[in-house]
């Protein structure tokens, strides 16, 4: 495989038109989006889809295994496109064959399964930067495996192959380009291993994972001696569509598949089922013996339109390589230049010291990085990805399906990773920082249609949210003329959310409401669960859930549910009995043999699902998601709030009282069981959530002050004041005198009492509420914007967490043992806080 070192990077040089013109016509979905995840998949052009549509509507394609005219047309097109694909990679069809597979992983598995079927098994070696799918091959290697952690180890191993005389079968696999950080490893290894193999008895084959590489660079297999035995790739990485992969096989290495046992339709010439089982494999070509069943012939035909469109727009992969290298270098330089007010760097980039964006043989257009604040503390990857998402910037975070490369870059050992797993860390979760170090990486990857605007937008995003400015002082000083014991607060409003993540039911003024140990009566007792996965739905993924509005009719003992925007008269209504065993036809099917396992905020629970088709149809039709209503079971299986987490949050106040972490203290020994754990139903973290009206007002002042005139009409609309409803609090408190507002004073509360006299109830403050992008969903329209999360990220970030509101828990013994009622509260009740600094 040949790579050009000397080609100078240039912005869209050689393209058919300026890239911005191409974007406007071919990629209209990029109008309001900055897409920086081309290593995951690049984007398909409008004209590709239109061309494919014309092809399908203008031709009749049958199953290529039949002999009809339509079937033979399909077979002919598949053969032609197979040849076109080989030529796209400069692979001589006399020397190579191409097998269509679902994706690169399917190609890897095809090779691994064939080697596993050999009588003695095989040995496997892989490079540390390998994709997870390459790592997984080691589980099939009977003769053992080895992970090579640097180039010197590989070179040393290759040099020793010539002296080995024992006969053995092996496979060495590595990526042409790391999908984590774009590092490119030496292409000479394939040629060197083949040369050593000719001088020894061992049979070491080479497998090149080119999936990441081919998305922006030309794969050149014209030098046969240097080409891998097997090359895997995915076409959607290059064209965006179709979802199809390929395994390119050197014909001289095809004997590897002779021990393959499984056969599918289309891969055999004859099969006997009577008497002794026997079959004859097709021998005419490698691809005929490996492509089991009917090929995805429509997807293969779409590949023809993909080649045509890509060539027309970008002319060549060399042009794409030059364009993306130019942008990557510019982005790297600008990220390196970002500094906080105190001179410390913002971005930690993970690059090999031998890599350079000026050298196509050493580096591709991918940037892997993490961020630090001005105090040198790491910023969690999940927070960055969430904030980027609400600003319509698409990036990737995590271990990026590259466990070895990520661990090596972050300095994690295998023992470290096992400790993290024992502590609860899983792929895709938000355990961002452990042992005061990041557990994952942020990734930006560029593609053929990326532009300078994408670079400028991302840099502006970092400058706005992650480049610290000189501090202007800390909010919430307690003034000396305010009596801490004067009950100057009251309950402005009370709300319950009968169905988790759906609309609020505002408790009417003058109505006293029961408080139970698990929170306000009827709060988050129901939820919607996906009928396929069993996972509870939430507004982060389905913002229209805000328009599902429950009403509690206690007189008739009904939960009345309407769907649609506020004040809409078109919404449908569903009534559910509040009794667990009802007489209504919709509720008689509840609970009886209807237990359903589900996942709520990471907890495994068993819910009681409504089995009536009318119930599931009501919610499914509105959301467009197959779901049904479910109810949390009786208190015998109540979930509990994590006091360990609350204790950490509790110390994260503006006085910065938290103790420094003790080196080597992770993981901590399990804490003793809490004799009085705080019960919760389907709420995320605590029985009740409290916010302050004055804090909402201050936040809205910050939102408005940050607003600037903008040519984008949508941006101006997103900067309007937000309603308190977006925080989905149970209790909103306000000062008795509006002129005496003290924003964020609740951050200093240790506990509070609501009411007076015999009706007074006490609540402990468990900690601050960590916010996510769900607060950006307008609870009246179901539309998602970028506020208030964008402003909270600037004004309320405390030690990596964006905080607003307080988790509270009622204290006391139930007055009513049957329903666990501790007492009642109502709108207008006095609120008397106690403070952290009180003795």
Curated annotation (Swiss-Prot):
Enzyme class: transferase
Functional summary from the UniProt entry: Sulfurates the molybdenum cofactor. Sulfation of molybdenum is essential for xanthine dehydrogenase (XDH) and aldehyde oxidase (ADO) enzymes in which molybdenum cofactor is liganded by 1 oxygen and 1 sulfur atom in active form.
Protein name: Molybdenum cofactor sulfurase
Residues that bear N6-(pyridoxal phosphate)lysine: 237
This enzyme's EC code(s): 2.8.1.9
Induction summary: By the nicotinate utilization transcriptional activating systems.
Annotated active site: 401
Pfam families per record: Aminotran_5, MOSC, MOSC_N
Pathway as given in its UniProt record: Cofactor biosynthesis; molybdopterin biosynthesis
């Amino acid at each position: 495989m040949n790579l050009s070192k000397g080609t100078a990077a240039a912005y869209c040089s050689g393209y058919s038109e300026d890239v911005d013109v191409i974007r406007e016509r071919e990629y209209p979905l990029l109008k309001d989006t900055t897409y920086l995840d081309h290593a995951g998949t690049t984007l398909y052009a409008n004209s590709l889809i239109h061309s494919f549509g014309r092809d399908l509507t203008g031709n009749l394609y049958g199953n290529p295994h039949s002999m009809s005219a339509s079937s033979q047309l399909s077979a002919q097109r598949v053969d032609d496109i197979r040849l076109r694909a080989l030529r796209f990679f400069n692979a001589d069809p006399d020397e190579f064959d191409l097998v269509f597979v679902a994706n690169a992983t399917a190609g890897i598995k095809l090779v691994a399964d064939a080697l596993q079927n050999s009588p003695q098994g095989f040995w496997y070696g892989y490079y540390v930067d390998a994709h997870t799918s390459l790592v997984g091959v080691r589980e099939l290697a009977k003769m053992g495996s080895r992970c090579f952690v640097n180039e010197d180890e590989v070179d040393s191993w290759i040099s020793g192959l010539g002296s080995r005389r024992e006969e053995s079968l092996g496979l060495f696999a590595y990526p042409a380009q790391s999908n984590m950080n774009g590092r490119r490893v030496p292409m000479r290894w394939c040629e060197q291993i083949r040369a050593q193999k000719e001088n020894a008895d061992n049979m070491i084959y080479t497998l090149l994972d080119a999936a990441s590489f081919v998305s922006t660079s030309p794969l050149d297999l014209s030098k046969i001696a240097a080409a891998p035995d097997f090359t895997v790739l995915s076409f959607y990485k290059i064209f965006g569509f179709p979802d199809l992969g390929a395994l390119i096989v050197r014909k001289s290495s095809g004997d590897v598949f002779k021990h393959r046992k499984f056969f599918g339709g289309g891969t055999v010439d004859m099969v006997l089922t009577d008497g002794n089982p026997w079959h004859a494999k097709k021998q005419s070509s490698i691809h005929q013996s490996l492509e089991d069943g009917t090929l995805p012939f429509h997807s293969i035909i779409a590949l023809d339109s993909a080649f045509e469109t890509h060539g027309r727009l970008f002319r060549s992969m060399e042009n794409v390589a030059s364009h993306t290298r130019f942008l990557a270098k510019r982005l790297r330089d600008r990220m390196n230049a970002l500094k906080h007010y105190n001179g410390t760097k913002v971005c930690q980039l993970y690059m090999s010291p031998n890599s350079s964006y000026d050298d196509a043989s050493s580096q591709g257009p991918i940037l892997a990085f993490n961020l630090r604040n001005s105090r040198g503390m790491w910023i969690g990857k999940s927070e960055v990805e969430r904030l980027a998402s609400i600003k319509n910037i698409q990036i990737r975070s995590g271990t990026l399906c590259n466990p070895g490369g990520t661990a090596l870059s972050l300095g994690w050992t295998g023992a470290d990773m096992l400790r993290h797993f024992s502590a609860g860390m899983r792929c895709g979760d938000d355990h961002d920082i452990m042992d005061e170090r990041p557990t994952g990486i942020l990734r930006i990857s560029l593609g053929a249609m990326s532009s300078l605007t994408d670079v400028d937008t991302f840099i502006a995003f970092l400058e706005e949210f992650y480049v610290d400015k000189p501090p202007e002082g800390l909010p919430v000083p307690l003034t000396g003329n305010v009596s801490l014991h004067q009950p100057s607060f009251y309950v402005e409003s009370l709300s319950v959310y009968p169905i988790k993540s759906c609309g609020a039911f505002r408790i009417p003024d003058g109505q006293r409401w029961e408080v139970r140990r698990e929170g306000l009566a009827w709060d988050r007792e129901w939820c919607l669960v996906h009928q396929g996965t069993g996972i509870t739905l939430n507004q982060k993924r389905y913002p229209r859930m805000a328009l599902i509005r429950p009403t509690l009719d206690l007189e008739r003992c009904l939960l009345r549910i309407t769907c649609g925007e506020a004040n809409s008269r078109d919404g449908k209504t569903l009534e559910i009995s509040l009794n667990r065993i009802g007489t209504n036809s919709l509720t008689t099917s509840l609970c009886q043999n209807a237990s359903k396992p589900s996942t709520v905020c990471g907890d495994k629970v068993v819910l009681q699902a409504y089995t009536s088709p009318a119930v599931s149809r009501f919610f499914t039709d509105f959301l467009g998601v197959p779901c049904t209503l479910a109810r949390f079971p009786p208190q015998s299986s109540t979930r509990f709030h994590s006091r360990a987490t609350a204790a950490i949050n509790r110390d994260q106040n503006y006085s910065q009282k938290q103790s420094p972490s003790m080196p080597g203290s992770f993981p901590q020994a399990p804490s003793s069981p809490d004799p009085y754990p705080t019960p919760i139903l389907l709420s995320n973290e605590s029985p009740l959530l409290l916010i302050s009206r004055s804090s909402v007002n201050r936040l809205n002042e910050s939102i408005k002050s940050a607003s600037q005139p903008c040519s984008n009409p949508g941006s101006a609309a997103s900067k309007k004041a937000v309603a308190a409803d977006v925080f989905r609090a149970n209790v909103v408190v306000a000062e008795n005198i509006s002129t005496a507002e003290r924003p964020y004073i609740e951050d200093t509360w240790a506990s509070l009492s609501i009411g007076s006299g015999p009706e007074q109830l006490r609540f402990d403050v468990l900690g601050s509420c960590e916010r996510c992008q769900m607060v950006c969903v307008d609870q009246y329209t179901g539309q998602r914007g970028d506020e208030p999360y964008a402003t909270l990220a600037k004004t309320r970030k405390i030690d990596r967490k964006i905080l607003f509101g307080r988790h509270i828990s009622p204290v006391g013994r139930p007055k009513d043992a049957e329903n666990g009622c501790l007492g009642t509260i109502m709108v207008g009740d006095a609120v008397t806080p106690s403070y952290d600094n009180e003795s």
